[in-house]
Amino acid sequence: MSKAPRHFLDLLDMSTGELRAILDASVAMKKRRKEGLIADKPLAGKTLAMIFDKPSTRTRVSFDVGMRQLGGEAIMLTGAEMQLGRGETIADTAKVLSRFVDIIMIRILSHDALTELAAHATVPVINGLTRRSHPCQVMADVMTFEEHRGPIEGRTVAWTGDDNNVLASWAHAAERFSFNLNVATPQELAPNKPLKDWIRSSGASIRLGTDPEAAVRGADCIVTDTWVSMGDKDGEHRHNLLRPYQVNAELMRLAKSDALFMHCLPAHRGEEVTDEVIDGPQSVVFDEAENRLHAQKGILAWCLGAGG
């Protein structure tokens, strides 16, 4: 009987030990790459299928380059080409792709489509992003924090903005990696009920509130994201609600003097963050972007049993 594939769908699906093994492998791969040691090709002969229902820059390039650096190949399939769930069923798509490729990464708004694909695939499936969660991004974020400030355990991360997929994965990471997460959102844009219920039952050190100053006070890191995400409506109303949550120099001064600033990009400068902050010495946004490549290499290797 064949082994069940190692999927990477959500941080809560894996143990802390498994997530730490992925990060350790990612750090080691980055170090070897920086030292010019590029002969190691653990995924030689392997093919990654990348499925996108929306255009993507960072996710597409980082997975494509990452797979190539590990010795494998990547092919891209768009929503228009796939008609995922509109023509051939998701289940049949999963079964067919599993006969052609060794691993699948999908970036799709519907989390249910992701889980259905994984349920029927006989090869590993990676969550490249859904409306519910963005685990690859937060693995890169944790890696970035630890590069600059050491172990994240026991530290405090502050989120200011609204409820979205990145926040959900930060909450999951807080539970798995044992750090404190302070969340500040407008009441109208507070975490959704399933996430709020999970936070209450998880025992994680996560504090929900509406005051951005209280959330960031004494924090080791401040994180934000765009105010209007893919598919969001009522942009003007959201902007009015979120304007007090902008990360600016005044807000940064309430955090620790060496606090990091993170943003998964693309950023809308002058909205959720000022130029002064995102271009300032505490900003590590481009390290985060680079670490998407390295963290995802660790994830690819783990899923295919070549590391971790």
UniProtKB/Swiss-Prot annotation:
The lineage of its organism: Bacteria, Pseudomonadati, Pseudomonadota, Alphaproteobacteria, Hyphomicrobiales. Its main location: cytoplasm. This is Ornithine carbamoyltransferase. Its EC number is 2.1.3.3. GO terms for biological process: arginine biosynthetic process via ornithine; citrulline biosynthetic process; L-arginine biosynthetic process. Keywords: Amino-acid biosynthesis, Arginine biosynthesis, Cytoplasm, Transferase. It catalyses: carbamoyl phosphate + L-ornithine = L-citrulline + phosphate + H(+). It is found in: Cytoplasm. It comes from Nitrobacter winogradskyi (strain ATCC 25391 / DSM 10237 / CIP 104748 / NCIMB 11846 / Nb-255). InterPro entries: Asp/Orn_carbamoyltranf_P-bd, Asp/Orn_carbamoylTrfase, Asp/Orn_carbamoylTrfase_sf, Asp_carbamoyltransf_Asp/Orn-bd, Orn/put_carbamltrans, OTCase_ArgI. GO terms for molecular function: amino acid binding; ornithine carbamoyltransferase activity.
